[in-house]
């Protein structure tokens, strides 16, 4: 695997192809700049990886209700602050780790920017999906509804949930109504349409998980059979 970049989803718009004039729906992501905060090696951690940080943590404090009240950072713990001091940068709110084969190309404090990618490249985008609250069987699992005729008593019910006396219970994992969305989701093999290095913007074809303002992780596509 290779290192990726963190960013913020700004919203959607459209761009036009120069040759055909065809409109392409794109999502605009403000990606980076990120800072390398830790380098893991086989000798120290048992595997090779690069940790990057994104988004400067605001200098806001909160008071701990301890025997001796004290002020601490609202967004970072003491352990996180101490960890970030080693990289020599400003306190960063979000940290992510990417497995890499070789860490020789990275150093603490190094900046990761959108020039890591190129137009036309395929990427995997990870983010938290939009929460939709409590949802029924049709909306959550795409169940087929029952007949809508006057005599039907099963319009949007699930049907059977399992056997009867034996086992006398509903098996774990049964698809039922419940909370929908607000989970970590990865959309794979999306195409980068344009890159704006001056404004740290990536224009990615199609939609990506989350609403505007969502933290997004973008990494080169993990295609089966290719390194």
From Swiss-Prot:
Pfam families the UniProt entry points to: Ribosomal_L3
Keyword Transmembrane helix attributed: no
Annotated GO biological process: translation
Disulphide bonds in the chain: none
Any one GO molecular function term: structural constituent of ribosome
Keywords, ordered alphabetically: Ribonucleoprotein, Ribosomal protein, RNA-binding, rRNA-binding
Entries under InterPro entries matching the protein: Ribosomal_uL3 (IPR000597), Ribosomal_uL3_bac/org-type (IPR019927), Ribosomal_uL3_CS (IPR019926), Transl_B-barrel_sf (IPR009000)
Region entry Disordered, spans: 144-166
GO cellular component labels: cytosolic large ribosomal subunit
Described function: One of the primary rRNA binding proteins, it binds directly near the 3'-end of the 23S rRNA, where it nucleates assembly of the 50S subunit.
Family: Belongs to the universal ribosomal protein uL3 family.
Assembly and binders: Part of the 50S ribosomal subunit. Forms a cluster with proteins L14 and L19.
Record-linked NCBIfam families: L3_bact (TIGR03625)
Listed name of the protein: Large ribosomal subunit protein uL3
């Amino acid at each position: 695997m290779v290192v990726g970049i963190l960013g913020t989803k700004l919203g959607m718009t459209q761009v036009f192809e120069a040759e055909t004039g065809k409109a392409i729906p794109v999502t605009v992501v403000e990606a980076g700049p990120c800072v390398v905060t830790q380098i893991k090696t086989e000798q120290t951690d048992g595997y090779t990886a690069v940790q990057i940080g994104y988004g400067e943590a605001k200098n806001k404090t909160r008071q701990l209700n301890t025997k001796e009240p004290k002020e601490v950072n609202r967004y970072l713990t003491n352990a996180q602050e101490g960890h970030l001091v080693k990289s020599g940068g400003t306190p960063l709110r979000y940290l992510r780790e990417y497995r890499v084969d070789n860490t020789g190309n990275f150093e603490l404090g190094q900046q990761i920017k959108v020039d890591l990618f190129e137009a036309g490249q395929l990427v995997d985008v990870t983010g938290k999906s939009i929460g939709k609250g409590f949802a029924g069987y049709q909306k959550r699992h795409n169940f087929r509804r029952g007949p809508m005729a006057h005599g039907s008593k099963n319009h949007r019910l699930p049907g059977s949930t399992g056997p009867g006396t034996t086992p006398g219970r509903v098996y774990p994992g049964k698809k039922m109504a419940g909370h929908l969305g607000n989970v970590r989701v990865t959309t794979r093999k999306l195409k980068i349409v344009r890159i704006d290095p001056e404004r740290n913007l990536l224009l990615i074809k199609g939609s990506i998980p989350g609403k505007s303002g969502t933290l997004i992780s973008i990494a080169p596509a993990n295609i089966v059979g290719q390194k």
